[in-house]
């Protein structure tokens, strides 16, 4: 799973119990969360994980939201973890971006967009974005060279251009989503499966040059399938600007009908955001 955004989604007792029940029902032996648990790793994410791991073994890697308030050294301690399940190894790390998904704009233009619009302007990274990505790629290749057997990779950022924004307004933000260079390494070292998130769109699993990609982030509640479906089932609550996700969610979030609807359909939403991989 990825992109639970516990704070933004107000993950309370009901949501946590629904998640625990789903994992048990699906027979999950190990849960990995590929970043963006919350905006506060220490006070929100780690206590959540500590409670959850009393019921199921789990691991995680950082997303950009998890990095808020962390030093570069603290960020690095969570990177490049390797776990073994049978013959299969799970490699987890955050990833990053180098603007290469939007090559037509200059570095200065990307920095202006980032400063004006993007969450990561709040982070205190030690190096610039292309340098962070280059360092990450070097570390990743050095690690992959040492591994044999089937490899699963979990990262937060987007490793292939097929998953980018296609809407003209949002295309400039593709610069901050990831880098195709990750995919090239996955192909080179015959990585079997890759799970990632960051961009809150869910895709069917697909194989690209021998690598099977899984992108099923939970995302923000305003983006959830159950939120969209609520308006179809209760059209009287539709607003004129339905394309504005914040506004349409604000119009329903306090409705008794929506609270009941969410309770009824939350399990299905969580299940749709779960990627299950059977290992050798």
Regions found by a protein language model. Give the residues of each.
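Active-site-proximal loop/helix segment associated with metal-binding centers of metalloenzymes
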Residues: 91-148, 157-169, 241, 247-254
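Conserved beta-sheet core of the metallophosphoesterase superfamily
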Residues: 52, 59, 86-89, 160-245
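Active-site environment of divalent metal-dependent phosphoester hydrolases
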Residues: 6-10, 38-44, 65-71, 83, ...
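Active-site neighborhood of phospho(di)ester-bond hydrolases with catalytic His/Asp-centered motifs
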Residues: 1-2, 31-36, 58-64, 77-79, ...
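N-terminal active-site segment of His-dependent metallophosphoesterases
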Residues: 1-54, 67-69, 118-123, 270, ...
């Amino acid at each position: 799973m990825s992109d639970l955004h516990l704070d933004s989604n107000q993950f309370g007792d009901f949501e946590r119990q629904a998640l625990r029940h789903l994992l048990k029902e699906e027979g999950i032996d190990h849960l990995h969360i590929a970043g963006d648990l919350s905006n506060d790793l220490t006070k929100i994410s780690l206590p959540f994980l500590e409670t959850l791991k009393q019921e199921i073994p789990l691991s995680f890697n950082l997303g950009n939201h998890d990095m808020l308030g962390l030093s570069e050294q603290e960020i690095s301690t969570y990177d490049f973890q390797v776990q073994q399940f049978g013959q299969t190894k799970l490699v987890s790390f955050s990833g990053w971006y180098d603007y290469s998904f939007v090559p037509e704009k200059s570095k200065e233009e990307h920095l202006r967009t980032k400063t004006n619009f993007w969450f990561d302007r709040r982070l205190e990274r030690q190096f610039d974005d292309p340098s962070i990505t280059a360092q990450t790629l070097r570390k990743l290749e050095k690690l992959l060279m040492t591994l044999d057997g089937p490899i699963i990779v979990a990262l937060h950022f987007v490793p292939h251009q097929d998953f980018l924004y296609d809407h003209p307004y949002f295309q400039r933000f593709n610069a901050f989503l990831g880098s195709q260079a990750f995919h090239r390494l996955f192909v080179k070292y015959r990585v079997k499966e890759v799970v990632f998130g960051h961009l809150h769109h869910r895709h069917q699993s697909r194989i690209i040059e021998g690598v099977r990609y899984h992108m099923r982030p939970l995302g923000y509640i305003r983006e959830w399938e159950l939120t969209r479906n609520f308006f179809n089932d209760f059209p009287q609550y539709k607003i004129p600007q339905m394309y504005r996700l914040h506004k349409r969610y604000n119009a329903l979030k306090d409705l008794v009908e929506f609270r009941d609807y969410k309770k009824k359909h939350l399990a299905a939403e969580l299940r749709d955001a779960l990627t299950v991989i059977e290992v050798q």
